[in-house]
Swiss-Prot record:
Residues reported to bind ATP: G153, A154, S155, G156, I157, G158, K159, S160
Membrane spanning residue stretches: none
Protein name (Swiss-Prot/TrEMBL): HPr kinase/phosphorylase
Complexes and interactors: Homohexamer.
Positions of region (Important for the catalytic mechanism of dephosphorylation): 264-269
Family indicated by similarity: Belongs to the HPrK/P family.
Anything else known: Both phosphorylation and phosphorolysis are carried out by the same active site and suggest a common mechanism for both reactions.
Native organism taxonomy: Bacteria, Bacillati, Bacillota, Bacilli, Lactobacillales
Protein's gene: hprK
Domain text: The Walker A ATP-binding motif also binds Pi and PPi.
Length: 310
C-alpha cells in the first residue's frame, strides 16, 4: 500500500513552494523519514532517496554555508528523482537553488511552520497508520463509552441489530459487516470501515440504513482503536459460561492481543444493555475497580469468619 504526496497534503497543512500534477502523484512507500545531515556534508553511502527528505535547522544551516554552484550540485544529489517530497521545517528560508533542484527532479517542495521533531513525529504517525497492512474481519465495530468494541459472532445472531440498538442509545458506529483492522503501533490495534460501507448498517428485513442520515453526525465515527472484543454466541445450557468474569479470553488480531468477553444470546436477553455493562465493567477494571476480585475477597472473608465462629 502506498500514499501519494497529494494524500499527505490533504491531511497535513503545508505551504507549497513547488509542485506539479505528476509530482503530487508520486508515492510514499515508507514511514521512515530521512534527515539528510551527513548527505549535506557529502557522505552518500547509506542515502535512501525513496524516503521523505526533511530539512531541520541543522541541515538548513549547513546548507546555507555552501555557496554558489556547490550548493545546487549538493541539493541535486539529495533531491533525487526517486524522492517523493522534500520538506523544510520551522518556516526556514528556502534558497533558489533548492527550488531549482526540485524543478529539475520534479519533486514537491514544501515548507512547514512546525518544529522539526514534532513534524517528524506527525509524519511518521500518519504514514504508519496509512501504510499499515489491513486485515478484514467480520463484525460490528462501535465506540461505546469511549471504548473501541469489536462485536463478533455467528452469521444471523444479531450483531448488526445490536449495533443499531447501541446507536439509538447514544453510542457511535464505526463499521458494520466488514471491519478493516490494522496495527497502528506495536501495542495498538485500530479499525475502520470499508469506504463503500462507511456509515452504513444492514438489518435483515429492512435493508441498508444510512446511520448518519437517520441519527446525525454524532452517531458515526471514522475509525477507533480496538480496546476489547465481544463475541455473541447462542445460549447452550450444556455449555459452561464464565459467570464470575475471572477467566478472561484473549484473542489476537495482527499480532496484537485483545481481551474478549463471550456473551450467550437467547430470547428475552437485552443484548445491547449487556454489551454496555460489559464495556463499563471493562473500563472499571482498567481504572482499578474489579468487582470479581471484590466478591472473591468478601467470600474469603466470610469463609474465614465462619471457620472462626465454629
Amino acid at each position: 500500500m502506498a500514499v501519494s504526496v497529494q494524500d499527505l497534503l490533504d491531511k497535513i497543512h503545508f505551504h507549497v513552494i513547488y509542485s506539479t500534477e505528476t509530482a503530487l502523484q508520486k508515492e510514499i512507500t515508507t514511514s521512515e523519514i530521512m534527515r539528510p545531515g551527513l548527505e549535506m556534508a557529502g557522505y552518500f553511502d547509506y542515502f535512501t532517496p525513496e524516503r521523505i527528505q526533511l530539512f531541520g535547522m541543522k541541515e538548513w544551516s549547513y546548507m546555507m554555508t555552501v555557496v554558489g554552484d556547490n550548493r545546487y550540485d549538493l541539493l541535486k544529489k539529495v533531491m533525487a528523482k526517486e524522492t517523493p517530497v522534500v520538506i523544510v521545517a520551522r518556516n526556514l528560508e528556502i534558497p533558489s537553488e533548492m527550488v531549482a533542484a526540485a524543478k529539475k527532479a520534479d519533486i514537491v517542495l514544501l515548507q512547514s511552520r512546525e518544529a522539526t521533531s514534532r513534524l517528524n513525529s506527525v509524519l511518521t504517525s500518519f504514514l504508519d497508520e496509512r501504510l499499515a497492512e489491513r486485515t478484514t474481519v467480520h463484525g460490528v465495530l462501535m465506540d461505546i463509552f469511549g471504548v473501541g468494541v469489536l462485536i463478533q459472532g455467528a452469521s444471523g445472531i444479531g450483531k448488526s441489530e445490536t449495533g443499531l440498538e447501541l446507536v439509538k442509545r447514544g453510542h457511535r458506529l464505526v463499521a458494520d459487516d466488514r471491519v478493516d483492522v490494522f496495527q497502528r503501533d506495536a501495542f495498538t490495534l485500530s479499525g475502520e470501515p470499508a469506504e463503500i460501507l462507511r456509515n452504513m448498517i444492514e438489518i435483515r428485513g429492512v435493508g441498508i440504513i444510512d446511520v448518519m442520515s437517520l441519527f446525525g453526525a454524532g452517531a458515526v465515527k471514522d475509525s477507533t482503536d480496538i480496546d476489547m472484543a465481544i463475541y455473541l454466541e447462542y445460549y447452550d445450557k450444556e455449555k459452561a459460561f464464565d459467570r464470575l468474569g475471572n477467566a478472561p479470553t484473549i484473542v489476537e488480531f495482527s499480532d496484537v492481543e485483545v481481551p474478549q468477553t463471550r456473551i450467550p444470546v437467547k430470547t428475552g436477553r437485552n443484548v445491547s444493555v449487556i454489551v454496555e455493562a460489559a464495556v463499563m465493567n471493562f473500563r472499571a477494571k482498567q481504572m482499578g475497580f474489579d468487582a470479581t476480585k471484590t466478591f472473591e475477597d468478601r467470600l474469603t472473608d466470610l469463609i474465614s469468619h465462619n471457620k472462626e465462629s465454629q
